[in-house]
Structure formats: C-alpha cells, structure tokens
Amino acid sequence: MFPLISFSPTSLDFTFFAIIISGFVFIITRWNSNSKKRLNLPPGPPGWPVVGNLFQFARSGKPFFEYAEDLKKTYGPIFTLRMGTRTMIILSDATLVHEALIQRGALFASRPAENPTRTIFSCNKFTVNAAKYGPVWRSLRRNMVQNMLSSTRLKEFGKLRQSAMDKLIERIKSEARDNDGLIWVLKNARFAAFCILLEMCFGIEMDEETIEKMDEILKTVLMTVDPRIDDYLPILAPFFSKERKRALEVRREQVDYVVGVIERRRRAIQNPGSDKTASSFSYLDTLFDLKIEGRKTTPSNEELVTLCSEFLNGGTDTTGTAIEWGIAQLIANPEIQSRLYDEIKSTVGDDRRVDEKDVDKMVFLQAFVKELLRKHPPTYFSLTHAVMETTTLAGYDIPAGVNVEVYLPGISEDPRIWNNPKKFDPDRFMLGKEDADITGISGVKMIPFGVGRRICPGLAMATIHVHLMLARMVQEFEWCAHPPGSEIDFAGKLEFTVVMKNPLRAMVKPRI
C-alpha cells in the first residue's frame, strides 16, 4: 500500500506555483465550470483554478488524514477534493462503502491512472494491486491466490514459519543480551516477516547480507514512488527531471539485483540438486510460464521483478507495524499481556512452543488481534478504487477515472458502530459481544485489508503471521516500557504503512 499524499504541506512554494499556473487559469476555470454543470459531485471545499484544494491542504499544516478528518466533520460521509488534476471522492461511511465495494463491487473494482514514476515500477500496472479490473488482474490474482495463498498451500509453509519464529526469538535474545534487555520491536518483527516472504517468493535460502541488500533496494523503491507535487500538477513535471532520472536509476538497480536472484532459482529448477538450499516450490515458479489472458507471451524478467517485489512489499511492513502496535498495547495494558500469557500457558503448558494449531484455539489472542487491526489498521486509506463507468452513489455522480478513497478510521472508530471506539478493548470481540467480519461481506465495520473484489489476497497469510508472532513473543518474553514506568506514545505517522511516530524500544524479560 502506497501513501495517498505524503509530501510535506509546508514545502509548497505559493509564489512559484502562482506564477506557473497564471497562464492557464482562464482555460481551466472555464473547463471546470462546464464540468460542474454536467456533474453532481459530492460536496467539498471550493478550490482554486488549476490547483484545486492543494493550497488549502498545504496551508492546513496537517497530515492528509487529519485534513480529511476535518472535512468529514464539515461535509459528511462522502465528499470531493480536487488535488490539482486529480479528483478524489472520499468515503467514510460503512453503509456507503458496503454498497460501493460489496453490493456493486464489480463496478467499483478498477484502479485509476498511475503517476509516471509509479508506472515505471509497476511495469505499467502489471501487478495484482495496481492492475485495472480486467483480464490481466484476473490472471495475476488467480495465480497468486490459487498457487500461493490457498489454505492448503499456506499449511505447506508451516515449517518455514516456525523456523522464522525460532530465529526471531534468538535475534531478540541476542539483541537484549547486548543492550541490557533493550530491543527495537519493528526492526526485528519486519525482518522475520521479510525472511518468510523471501523464501516463499524465491524458494532459496539467502545469507544475511543478501537479505539486507534486497530489503534496502525495496525500501529505496518505496521512497522513490512517494507522491510528489508534480503527480498532482503534471505541468510541473519539467521541474522534476532530476527526480525522474533518479527513479530510472533506482529501477535499473532493482531489476539488475533481483534478476540475479531470479536466475539463481531458474538454475536450481533446471538442475535439480545443484542448490542445496532450494525448496520444492516458490511463488516465482508459478510466474515463469504464467499465461495471461489476452497475451501470448509469459512475463518478462522485468515483470517478474515487479511481481516478486509486490509479493515482498505487500506482507512485510503490514506485519511488522502490526506487531509494533501490538507490543505497544501489551506494554500499555499489562493486564491484557497477563491474560494473553495465561491463555498461552493454559493451551500449551510449559514444555513446548506455541504452534499454529494452538493459535486457532486461543480465543483471547484472536480477540486481541481483531482489536489491534481495528484500532491500528495498516494505513489510513485503502488502496484507491475507480469505477468502470460513470455511476451514482448516495445521489451523487461518481465519474469514471476519479480516485475513490476509503477513509478507514471513519469506519473503525465510528461511535455509531463501536462502543467507546477510542479505547483499545479486546473484550469487545469476546463471545456474545461485538463482532466484525474483516472481509466485509456480511457488513463493513472494519476493513484493514480492504473489502470486495480488491480485498488483499494475502489476508489469511498476514493474520497467520501476526497471530503466531505475537504468541511466540509473549510466550518467550515479558514486555516492559523503556524507560521503566514511562508511558507509550501512540502517535502515528504515515510511511509505507502507519508506523509509530517514535519507534518502539522495549525492555524484555525472558520467561522460559
């Protein structure tokens, strides 16, 4: 998931942009005037010619999600923003989201046009997440779900997950020994998730240097595709030629490095036994000869790089940040941590490690993770939707091609849906109390993984990773604040996902 708008609002130079756009004001104003006569868009703040609401957002000095939250209070559950050349229709009501993405899911299942930088890295939208609703998307998603993310296939990777959990615990113990019990939570959690996904993706073991290099490259890619002002005002693109050149350099580095790993797997398949670390199956294996509807050719090397990068990015940071927020809540609520540990002990005793079969029996752990995903979804907005053809919603026109954004906290913290929504309370999900179908099929109450046809295909895998990782970490360690007695700062900031503004460092005390 990429951030919706993450450039600094204070970085906009108003005089510069005023000069740039002055020659276009008359033409664009007339065009907008004619458009408004044709369309009945949802309400929203009046904007300036050409730039729309960009200046208002910049002058607010707020992150985009806070700006959207303020507008929701003024304009209601569906409103319009014009951010330069992009029109955004933002939904923050559970009923409207259910109508759009579930009841009328096929119509709202496409994606809008990408900016030029992102197109470089997506191979012109050749990914499960970015592809327009159609044959390419169907082919890519069907392959990923059936061959990698089915319940049967996920079970086959059980030993890999257990091995990764053992290594995670050893890494935490080692770091704690070297730092008087103090560890970085996010760094360790995302490394464990990344290692699992690397082996699932490529089917070969890698040394730590290779793992860290791959991680570094993918992080650089994510920073490179971060939105810029010229994504919203393409007329400014000539002023960002250095950034485009840098993006092409990053892409070349990504392709060159990842293709080397791809070729290693290809050789292992062609020469069985030549790579002693090679596993019997990987995601990459399913892509080599993948048939795409409407195409005669199989994916190119560059497309393989794109699809593998999507697989890795999609599950690394979402899992890592969920664990960081989860440990933070356990530290802030020691009574919850005690209940979770007691449930683990009553389920597995003192003599063995928690495994995935145990996790399925832990009612309080299940409730804790649901509440974690409700209170701390991976991002503030779901991936952007677009309608296949102009339609209406709530009596307003929704034109084809506009960005349809779903503001997640508007639903997961709606007091009409949740009792005391600001409170972190796993008991709300215990038997006989509140519940939520995170797929959204029976009703939208929380959508940490999206809903409808474009729901995250890795939902089941992600929840397995989060449940198992939390259970092992709590079984092995008591988690305490650093410095002792200090309060946890739950302020967040948007990077690739919503992370803690002040990264969590925690004290650990081994239990067993």
Swiss-Prot record:
Pfam families given in the database record: p450
A GO CC annotation given for this chain: membrane
Membrane topology according to the record: Single-pass membrane protein
EC number: 1.14.-.-
Keyword Heme: yes
A single BP term in Gene Ontology: fatty acid oxidation
TM spans (from-to): 9-29
Cofactor(s) the protein needs: heme
Keywords: Heme, Iron, Membrane, Metal-binding, Monooxygenase, NADP, Oxidoreductase, Transmembrane, Transmembrane helix
This protein's record includes keyword Ribosomal protein: no
Record localization: Membrane
Binding, heme: C456
Molecular function (Gene Ontology), one example: heme binding
Family: Belongs to the cytochrome P450 family.
Role this protein plays: Catalyzes the epoxidation of physiological unsaturated fatty acids in vitro. Can use laurate, oleate, linoleate, linolenate and vernolate as substrate.
Stated name of the protein: Cytochrome P450 77A4
Lineage: Eukaryota, Viridiplantae, Streptophyta, Embryophyta, Tracheophyta
Gene: CYP77A4
